[in-house]
Amino acid sequence: MHETSSGPHVMSGAATDMRSRDERARDRHAPCSTIARASGEQLIATATPYDRFVLVEVQAPWPGDMRTPPWMRSDWSPERVGALNRAIAGAEAAGVRAKFVALAPDRQYSVPGNPRAIILERHAGHCIRWVRQEFFLGEEDGLDQMCAVAGGPLGQDGFRVGRVRELLICAHGQVDSCCGRLGVRLHRAARQMLGGDTTTRVWRCSAIGGHRFAPTALDFPSGRMWGHLVEDDLPVLLTGREIDPIWDRYRGAVGLDTRAEQAVEGELLRRYGPALVDAELVFRVEDGYVDVSVDLVGIHDRYRMVVITGEPRMVVANCKGMTSPVTPISVS
């Protein structure tokens, strides 16, 4: 059995803040990631689900408000900014849960004056693998083609399984100081460890949620999110050959819609290890339990896992002192 807790939300409901006055005063000044680590809050099932990610190279610094598109502080032309803003509106109108994320241009990966955009969608019929299209906005029709896909419905033609792994590390210090301080440090260490390897690209990115779990990382094509990473975790994370040493850093798969599914998939990841990325998983969520089938080469397993929800409690969600309720969830 393992306990999990939800990601930060705007405070609501009747969750009780059980901290003493001295603890609350201390928490107003301590970094949010330090508080979260000290509290023992587990990370499983804290990944916000999305249908689509739109990754766009945009020079930092980015806006300090997560609701403001990252390109609004760039030196881009009004035409480019307007097209991307219309893509956001188009995705919303199509009912697509799309997350637009800035990538800091990289000396090794990027083309000066020709920003890259990568669009990722959940693979149809595969809940933890993402397919992709890639565009260059400075090329003829590149901007229009990218925005048509980014702002359109799901399931368009042109998506393929990519050969390049994209590892995003949040370094958005304008939103949260823990993300800036810890994310930049982890990104630097990961880039040094990889050297000239271009089969994995490690990016500094804008906010992807879960500031108190900084440094946070999002890994594609698996769509797996990680938190509280340290430099000693990088050999395991980058090689992907084992899971156990960093399993307690796992936040969940952003392609799964419910916290119950994320908690169950996390338990399956612990049991099956890295091979789970190639599995076909089918979930059926009922009141109080989840049925799941696991199909791998030579393996056809079925499980029923019980879901236990605990009482909400308050946590410090970010370095600005915002508090929000989280609800523990266990599976067995």
Features from the language model and the residues they span:
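Histidine/cysteine-enriched polar flanking segments
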Residues: 2-3, 7-332
